[in-house]
């Protein structure tokens, strides 16, 4: 099987372009909110839709991401992903971009790749990082927008940390054993932080794993940012956030997190944040 996949990878290699070359040759645009982005190849996305999606990021969040550029490309993959050594992939693998969609390349592609562009990356600017998003793998607007905003959320938390007000809200929810979480990372780190009721000292008080708590708060904050941005860009139902790996955070708890994020980072002009409840029949 590995030989077949390896042969497939070799057969399509000639149609791929290095991500760094894409960055050098593609004009990067600056949205009205200050976020940098570009489109390359047959993305299958209307330009107006991409602009609307990117512009959903509030100015106050985009201001922290000046070293990021988001590239919408048909398919992104790691060089050698289909080879026998694919199980030992490292961050040093070359990121390759397909300018078109083919079923063969799609089998090897992944949702996004992060690339350190360095001094020769984008418009001569040093130290900018590129995030290459596979638009043709993320076929619908919901999936593509969510993938973009998840990356925005993680990058923002890396730059700024977690506000005290959000940390307090989320930790109080966790201690109160509110049902579910917003991602597998948040779900697992929350359980580790609280120790499943097993981390108790001699005085019967629960011991908190502080490192896991930090990881949990960061994951919960980046998740909340991503879901908030998604709500500004796409109309969706609460149930669409569900995943098999973990129970989704209870609706009221999620609403409380999103309202706080909206207060911290108000929407840009022409965007509106709202939570609508359905009446039970």
Question: Which residues are covered by each model-predicted region?
Answer:
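Short, solvent-exposed interaction modules
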Residues: 197-205
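Ligand-binding pocket scaffold of soluble enzyme catalytic domains
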Residues: 25-28, 48-49, 131-137
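Active-site scaffold of zinc-dependent metalloenzymes
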Residues: 77-169
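Zn2+-dependent metallopeptidase catalytic core
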Residues: 45-71
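Pan-zinc metallopeptidase signature
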Residues: 2-30, 204-281
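Conserved catalytic/binding loops enriched for acidic/polar residues
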Residues: 41
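Post-HEXXH active-site segment of zinc metalloproteases
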Residues: 142-146, 158-197, 238-246
């Amino acid at each position: 099987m590995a030989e077949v996949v390896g042969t497939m990878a070799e057969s399509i290699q000639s149609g791929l372009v290095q991500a760094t070359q894409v960055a050098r040759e593609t004009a990067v645009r600056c949205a009205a909110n200050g976020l940098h982005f570009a489109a390359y190849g047959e993305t299958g996305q209307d330009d107006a839709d991409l602009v609307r999606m990117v512009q959903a990021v509030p100015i106050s969040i985009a201001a922290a991401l000046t070293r990021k550029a988001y590239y919408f490309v048909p398919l992104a993959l790691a060089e050698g992903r289909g080879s026998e050594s694919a199980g030992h992939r490292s961050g040093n693998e070359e990121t390759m971009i397909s300018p078109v969609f083919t079923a063969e390349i799609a089998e090897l592609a992944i949702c996004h790749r992060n690339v350190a562009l360095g001094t020769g990356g984008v418009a001569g600017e040093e130290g900018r990082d590129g995030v290459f998003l596979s638009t043709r793998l993320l076929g619908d607007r919901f999936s593509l927008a969510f993938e973009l905003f998840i990356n925005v959320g993680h990058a923002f938390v890396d730059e700024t940390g977690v506000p005290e007000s959000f940390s307090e809200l989320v930790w109080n929810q966790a201690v109160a054993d509110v049902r579910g979480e917003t991602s597998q990372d948040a779900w697992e780190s929350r359980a580790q932080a609280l120790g499943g009721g097993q981390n108790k000292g001699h005085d019967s008080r629960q011991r908190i794993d502080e490192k896991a708590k930090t990881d949990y708060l960061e994951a919960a904050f980046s998740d909340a940012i991503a879901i908030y941005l998604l709500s500004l860009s796409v109309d969706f139902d609460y149930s669409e956030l569900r995943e098999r790996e973990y129970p989704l955070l209870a609706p009221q708890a999620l609403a409380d997190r999103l309202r706080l994020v909206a207060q911290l980072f108000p929407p840009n002009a022409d965007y509106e944040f709202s939570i609508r409840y359905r009446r039970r029949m």
